[in-house]
């Protein structure tokens, strides 16, 4: 067995490292640095997800598809739907506006959801999380991961 960790240089070598003016390889490195910090290096995102972004296929639409169908679901699995950590990995905590966040959070007020006393119930969620489809279609959302 030979360990094969993600290698963003592969993307550079095969010219799959740019979508518009986004440095895909640098974005992958930043995502993996955060995953390593929050989880471990064995769960980093492989460069193979992005190798199809070559030539005419280096489009925002293809990048969106990779994130929507592969990267975000993988992060949901890795972090057991701990969306705060997913937000950290994707840089949503530091985005210049909410419209660029991949994961939106909305405060939930329990008394607006339930009738009667709920004090006896512990660990009620304080936020509801949703995937922001519009952010997936905006190149700035990906740039602000960096």
Residue ranges and their predicted role:
Residues 1-146:
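C-terminal regulatory/interaction module of P-loop NTP-utilizing enzymes
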């Amino acid at each position: 067995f030979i360990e094969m960790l993600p290698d963003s240089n592969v993307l550079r070598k095969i010219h799959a490292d740019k979508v518009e003016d986004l440095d895909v390889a640098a974005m992958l490195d930043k995502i993996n640095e955060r995953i390593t910090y929050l989880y471990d290096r064995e769960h980093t995102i492989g460069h193979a997800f992005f190798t199809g972004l070559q030539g005419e296929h280096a489009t925002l639409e293809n990048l969106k598809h990779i994130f929507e169908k592969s990267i975000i679901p993988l992060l949901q699995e890795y972090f057991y739907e701990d969306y705060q950590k997913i937000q950290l990995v994707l840089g949503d905590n530091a985005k210049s506006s909410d419209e660029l966040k991949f994961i939106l959070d909305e405060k939930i007020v329990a008394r607006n959801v339930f009738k009667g006393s709920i004090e006896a119930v512990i660990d009620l969620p304080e936020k509801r999380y949703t995937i922001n489809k519009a952010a997936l279609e905006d190149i700035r959302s990906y740039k602000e991961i960096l």
